[in-house]
């Protein structure tokens, strides 16, 4: 798994985790949009990184919205992952052309602690700015999940994971 250049525009994953830690004490957080690029043949790596964050967000009174392209979340997986089944909503078979628009609308409402959407193509500057504004307005987090195949991964970048944090620099 590696993150794209867009992921570093608003924040890194480690700062997202620190924001979540503050949610428990302050009960407020600013909006965040982050892209997660992962290998399709290694979904466990993504789960290891995101599940603790999603479990923490599940303690809020707000919903978690999953905008999935084809697959449907299984109840068994949601429960086994420690996510609150009663707070997870899913819209599946959403056309990619509607994913960004749906994410913006959902983030803006403030009804969701996190909105997760799958996109195959890079965001435009305008789409990214619109998502950031919506996340800030709704005080929510948005994750753009971008799967890549193992063959395209080998041609794009050799390192598997890059997490930039000002804590280590």
Curated annotation (Swiss-Prot):
Consequence of substituting residue 169 to A: Great decrease in degradation by Lon protease
Residues annotated as transmembrane: none
A biological process term (GO) from this entry: SOS response
Mutagenesis / variant outcome for changing residue 108 to A: No effect on degradation by Lon protease
Subunit note: Interacts with FtsZ.
NCBIfam families, per database record: PRK10595.1, SOS_SulA_coli
Protein name in the entry: Cell division inhibitor SulA
Species this chain originates from: Escherichia coli (strain K12)
Gene it is expressed from: sulA
């Amino acid at each position: 798994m590696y993150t794209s250049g867009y992921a570093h525009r608003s924040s890194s994953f480690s700062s997202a985790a620190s924001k979540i830690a503050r949610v428990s004490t302050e009960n407020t957080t600013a909006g965040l949009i982050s892209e997660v690029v992962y290998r399709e043949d290694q979904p466990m790596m993504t789960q290891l990184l995101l599940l603790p964050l999603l479990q923490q967000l599940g303690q809020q009174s707000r919903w978690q919205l999953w905008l999935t392209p084809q697959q449907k979340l299984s109840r068994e997986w949601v429960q086994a992952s420690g996510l609150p089944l009663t707070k997870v909503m899913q819209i599946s078979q959403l056309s990619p052309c509607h994913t960004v628009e749906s994410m913006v609308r959902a983030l803006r409402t403030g009804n969701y602690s996190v909105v997760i959407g799958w996109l195959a193509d890079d965001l435009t500057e305008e789409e990214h700015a619109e998502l950031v504004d919506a996340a800030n307005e709704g005080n929510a987090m948005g994750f753009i999940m971008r799967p890549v195949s193992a063959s395209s991964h080998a041609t794009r970048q050799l390192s598997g994971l890059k997490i930039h944090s000002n804590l280590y620099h």
